[in-house]
Amino acid sequence: MTAPKHVSIVIPPQLGDVEGSVAWAAQELAQALRQRDVTVQIGAEPLGGIVVEVAGAGMKAQPGAGAAFPPRAEAMALERSGDHILAWGFDTRGLVYALTELADRVRTGQGEDLFEGTFPLVEQPTARIRSMARLFCAEEEDKLWYYDKQQWRDYLTMLASNRFNRFALTLGMGYNYPYHNPWISDVYFYFPYPFLLAMDGYGIDVKELSAEERDHNLDMLAFIGRECARRGLEFQLALWTQRYDFDDVPRANYTVRGVTEENLAPYCRDAITALLRHVPEITGLTFRVHVEGGIAEGEYGFWEEAFAGVAAAGRPVEIDMHGKGLDHKMIDIARRSGMPVAASPKYLAEHMGPPYHQSAIRDKEYPPESAKSEREQLSEGSRKFLRYSYGDLLTRDKDYKVIYRIWAGTQRVLLWGDPVFAAGYGRSSMFAGSDGVEWCEPQSFKGRMGTGMPGQRFNYKRHGYATRQDWRKYDYQYRVWGRLLYNPEAPRQSWMRWLERECGDLAEACEKGLSWASRVLPLVTLAHGPSASNNHYWPEIYTNLGLIEGSGKRAYGFDMDGPTRFGNAPTFDSALFASPREFAELLLAGKSSHRYTPLDVADWLDDMAAGCETALSTARSSPDYNRAEPQRILADVEILGGMARHFAQKFRAACWAELFIATKASELIEPMLGHARNAVLAWERLAAVSRELYHDDLTYGPQSWLRGSWHSRLPEMQAELLDLEALRGFGGTESVAGTPALAKAIAALKGHRPTRAQPDASAPTAVFAGGEPLPIRIEVEAEDAPVLHYRHINQAERWQSMPMQAERGGYTATIPAEYTKSDFHLQYFVSLRQNGQSTLIPGLAPDLANEPYFTVMQR
């Protein structure tokens, strides 16, 4: 068809949005059309050419009757009949999504049809909250984007166009009080109020900060708020720190003066009110309410004052409390303020795993007999189970939102972009009555704790790779995150059109390669959890943890039970994944396990590596291979594919190493060495890629394990390999013979068959009545009686299990009435043996994107 020369965008007067978000979205569409030399008219009546009719819920519209349009907040639809396009939205945000979808098609399209794509398109949100957090951590690097108004316009437009509905500007997250006191140097916005406000009557200020810069900071905050509102985005301001030891930070670059024990709470209260009044577009505030935010746990009086400051602004403002250390008394204090209340636990520790919520926390996260200290009485005491997951927040009758925060501990530098996993996060974000997800964006924590470097915000050292704005490298990442959180069934064309524009003939190779690559680090993180803290464990630029002993103790020793070695690191799902040590113990005992083994993980990683390698092989023969975007994508795919090979070999080596540690048998040394050698070879290959592309010192913190690059990690791995090879001649092991039990363990290890799953199995019931027995039945053949594993959806509790009974060609078990009588929903899975293989129902699908358990909601 011939490209049209004129488009009319018809906005009926009854929409009542002449200056608001719909008008902004219409202008976005008009601008995209004008960039393609199309004349555009926006008005109440069409003036010829293609007509884009904008219609809201309850309005008469053509060409379709709209009968199938979902009556749900944020729903949108596009219909087309010839030269007439209907852009429908249930509400303002739905209309914004409809119009920006058309604008995106115009911008990314390359054919004659300006609006080429899926028609009709009807979409509605799965995750109610879809938030993106941007952290200010480094004055040297972050002022660059904070003061850049055009950057904000472009960035917020990108978020709104990709169906995010909330933006969270996050201040004060760079340090954890009091643990990081010795490291405190860059405190810009750490205690944020005096960097934004002059509060009469308190005498609190920042010595080195001019009044002009302080006022400029506040003006920029107000600008960001207005630009969010203009695009229909909620504006969340995260205030993570309420105090630190202002008089005991000799390395700090700014001095906060005038804070006393007596004036801290009223000052924070009044500053919160002043911020909310000066920036009326702020729709919510996030607070870290455990000791790391500066307020000792149990000091509820401070929070009564702070939340009163929120209420004093005179409008509804959501009080969002970070989950760690959160107790129900704190929730009640927030509730009594009269404001909307939310809790934001971590999705999977301070990292990123596969999309499902971990079945169980690490043993280290269950509450101890006594708290570490009085000021940590909750986060390191009675509420420790909330440290890194949803804890006991998902009660049947909760009256607060639960919004998961996906921290940037796993991956910060390399590209991510798997539509399958992104859709999985969209589905799991609503787990058991939850409300959504907030992502910490790529490059979060860049330059924190005083490690910011001018000119290194973009990580690249090779010329031509850095993008115009820091976030643009991750444009595709935001696209798949946002659109598939909104609608996990979004059409493939919604991300492929961007790849086709940027990558040409390599669009499909880039899609497939990046999809495989994006699963690598989430899986490694889940199966290998030496530390839940992003301050100590960075899987992306991995600090080596030795197979026997040696490297890694300083990074990981505080957060895992010793001995500190690779095979002894726990998993982040103790109910469904076994560590190498646990697996070796089972092999030596001649037992099987229902859990996934390190060899299962290694097999998955090899599949991911093969997928990356196939995409790379395809790409290298294309004339589009040297385009900038494919080069950025494929370099990261090559690094991640190499990491998949490395960790696959490391998991295998760890199984042999754990058998060796338990038996000292010399015959185990060579298999262990073979896998360890292959692991190092894989890292050498990926380090060769990073050495040419990325800076030698990527700074995400001051400690050695939070900075460096892939090639800087290599010498430690090579040194460990030399140490392992020295075991050959070590007198204590060179002639130790094996035992019959070891022979069986070796045979089982060599002949290991993968754990099977039945992810397509359907749950017999989706709801239950509390206080009544809950029968569970499965139709399956098994060698022995299957085992039912069940638990309240409460991470403070351990899993229960019972054997199932054969009945009418299947198996049944009943969860007793006294167990179902609780405030919580239930989850369960079944384990069994079939043809000599462990089997889980439902277990994980081959793409790892589903929930490996059934969820049963209480009526």
Residues covered by each model-derived region:
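Feature activates predominantly on carbohydrate-active enzymes
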Residues: 2-8, 12-18, 23-28, 32, ...
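Catalytic-core regions of glycoside hydrolase
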Residues: 34, 109-110, 165, 177-180, ...
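Conserved, mostly hydrophobic/aromatic
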Residues: 91, 159, 287, 499, ...
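Alpha-helical linker/edge segments of TPR/alpha-solenoid repeat scaffolds
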Residues: 700-734
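Aromatic-lined, polymer-binding surfaces characteristic
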Residues: 240-265, 278-283, 290-300, 631-648, ...
